């Protein structure tokens, strides 16, 4: 079966990753001891996408957990599903990266990276037909950003024809953990543009807004934010984990979603949104799902899709939904908002469907959009980057680890190019005259 190897790096990556495994294990009926306690054969049919089956009918996540300090790993290990993971797959250092990208990418992380690759290789060799890798990390810190991108480029070298999907938590505009976030994020994006096939952008502020506005939580915790992320991750990977009518895999997703290789940064969303542990009291309808899914308040990255145009969209419906109704609703959204979709990619909205709904819901939908509005997010980081870099503030932390200023300049211009590319395609229109002229030339009578 088409297996995926999951990697989680750094504090953020490990916390999101741990939550993801809780959700997926629950959906597949895997108990905390790795035994199958489910009720439906469908849960086991494609379980090998994420789990290895070991002696005694025990299912073990195909996950590699990486950090440069032992703290977060210890809390994952003592968490509800901690005993599920393979003990050998915990790879950690002792020194920490101290939110310094250079430490994660060049010094501390580089020392640990070979032992991580050994574990990754071992997991990949055990696969029947490896589909690709997914990595959860943040872009604002040291380990997830610096070492995460180092791992991505190393895995890329070794498995050049396998998909690389990243779930990247981007620094948010108002909620900042560290002052050097813009540096770390810019250096990371510089790497992701080249080495990732699809990057799902998530940001804490957007998640915070969803918790506050939509879910009416007065004091959202990181647990609540991570819960939202894990729902989306579960939704994106549904088609891979369950049999459905339209099965997508990471590669099909990329083929449908990435019109130009560098523009692979997606916004994600989910509907219907519910708080952790709450029950759904009313049935949702397909029209409600489609309208909530395209709603700007629903996006998990702080960019407003109304500021740009969609190049491509994918929607994964789950549960007992009528595909006919889905198609009709998706078409009506497109025709009513046609100026928000580029007209030079016809049929740029893809729908897939899986019969099995998530726990506690009758039906749900996961939204993935490749919108030119994502440039807002990069612009914001670039502005903050430039403000500090002009004064060379905090640079000594990076140059002290052997980095060169040149690398900062390169990363900055690569990110500005990315913004310019998004802008260029946002403004691109099909010129009526051009089309007519071409037709005319073809049909011109042969000259005597």
Swiss-Prot record:
GO terms for molecular function: GTP binding; GTPase activity; metal ion binding; structural constituent of cytoskeleton. GTP binds at residues 11, 69, 138, 142-144, 204, 226. One of its GO terms (cellular component) is cytoplasm. Its cofactor is Mg(2+). Its main location: cytoplasm. It holds the Pfam family Tubulin_C. The keyword Nucleotide-binding applies. Mg(2+) binds at residue 69. Coiled coil: none annotated. The keyword Protease does not apply. PROSITE patterns: TUBULIN, TUBULIN_B_AUTOREG. InterPro entries: Beta-tubulin_BS (IPR013838), Beta_tubulin (IPR002453), Tub_FtsZ_C (IPR008280), Tubulin (IPR000217), Tubulin/FtsZ-like_C (IPR037103), Tubulin/FtsZ_2-layer-sand-dom (IPR018316), Tubulin/FtsZ_GTPase_sf (IPR036525), Tubulin_C (IPR023123). Keywords: Cytoplasm, Cytoskeleton, GTP-binding, Magnesium, Metal-binding, Microtubule, Nucleotide-binding. SMART domains: Tubulin (SM00864), Tubulin_C (SM00865). It is found in: Cytoplasm, Cytoskeleton. GO terms for biological process: microtubule-based process. PANTHER family: TUBULIN. Tubulin is the major constituent of microtubules, a cylinder consisting of laterally associated linear protofilaments composed of alpha- and beta-tubulin heterodimers. Microtubules grow by the addition of GTP-tubulin dimers to the microtubule end, where a stabilizing cap forms. Below the cap, tubulin dimers are in GDP-bound state, owing to GTPase activity of alpha-tubulin. Dimer of alpha and beta chains. A typical microtubule is a hollow water-filled tube with an outer diameter of 25 nm and an inner diameter of 15 nM. Alpha-beta heterodimers associate head-to-tail to form protofilaments running lengthwise along the microtubule wall with the beta-tubulin subunit facing the microtubule plus end conferring a structural polarity. Microtubules usually have 13 protofilaments but different protofilament numbers can be found in some organisms and specialized cells. Belongs to the tubulin family. This is Tubulin beta chain. It comes from Melampsora lini.
């Amino acid at each position: 079966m088409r297996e995926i190897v999951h990697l989680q790096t750094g504090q953020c990556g490990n916390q999101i990753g741990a939550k993801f495994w809780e959700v997926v294990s629950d959906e597949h009926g895997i108990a905390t001891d790795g035994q199958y306690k489910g009720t439906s054969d469908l849960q086991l049919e494609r379980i090998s996408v994420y789990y290895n089956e070991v002696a005694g009918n025990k299912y073990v996540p195909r996950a590699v957990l990486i950090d440069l300090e032992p703290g977060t790993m210890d809390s994952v290990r003592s968490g509800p599903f901690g005993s599920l993971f393979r003990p050998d797959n915990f790879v950690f250092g002792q020194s920490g990266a101290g939110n310094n990208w250079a430490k994660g990418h060049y010094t501390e992380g580089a020392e640990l990276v070979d032992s991580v690759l050994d574990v990754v290789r071992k997991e990949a060799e055990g696969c029947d037909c490896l589909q690709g890798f997914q990595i959860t990390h943040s872009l604002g810190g040291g380990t997830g950003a610096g070492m995460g991108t180092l791992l991505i480029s190393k895995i890329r070298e070794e498995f050049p024809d396998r998909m690389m999907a990243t779930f990247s938590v981007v620094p948010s505009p108002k909620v900042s953990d560290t002052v050097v976030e813009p540096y770390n994020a810019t250096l990371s994006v510089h790497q992701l543009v080249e080495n990732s096939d699809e990057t799902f952008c998530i940001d804490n502020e957007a998640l915070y807004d969803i918790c506050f506005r939509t879910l009416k939580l007065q004091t959202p915790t990181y647990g609540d934010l991570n819960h939202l992320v894990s729902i989306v991750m579960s939704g994106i990977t549904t088609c891979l984990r369950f049999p459905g009518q339209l099965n997508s895999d990471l590669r099909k997703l990329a083929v449908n979603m990435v019109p130009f290789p560098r523009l692979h940064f997606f916004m994600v969303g989910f509907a219907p949104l519910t708080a952790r542990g709450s029950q759904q009291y009313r049935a949702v309808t397909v029209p409600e799902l489609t309208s909530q899914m395209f709603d700007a308040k629903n996006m998990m990255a702080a960019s407003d899709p109304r500021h740009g145009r969609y190049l491509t969209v994918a929607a994964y419906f789950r549960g007992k939904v009528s595909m006919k109704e889905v198609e009709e609703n998706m078409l009506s959204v497109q025709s009513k908002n046609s100026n928000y979709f580029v007209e030079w990619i016809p049929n740029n909205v893809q729908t897939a469907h899986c019969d099995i709904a998530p726990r506690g819901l009758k039906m749900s939908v996961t939204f993935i959009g490749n919108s030119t509005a994502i440039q807002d997010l990069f612009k914001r980081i670039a502005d903050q980057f430039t403000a500090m870099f002009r004064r060379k503030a905090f640079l000594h932390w990076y140059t002290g680890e052997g980095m060169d200023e040149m690398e900062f300049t390169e990363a900055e211009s690569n990110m500005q190019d990315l913004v310019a590319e998004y802008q260029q395609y946002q403004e691109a229109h099909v010129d009526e005259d051009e089309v007519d002229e071409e037709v005319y030339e073809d049909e011109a009578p042969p000259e005597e």
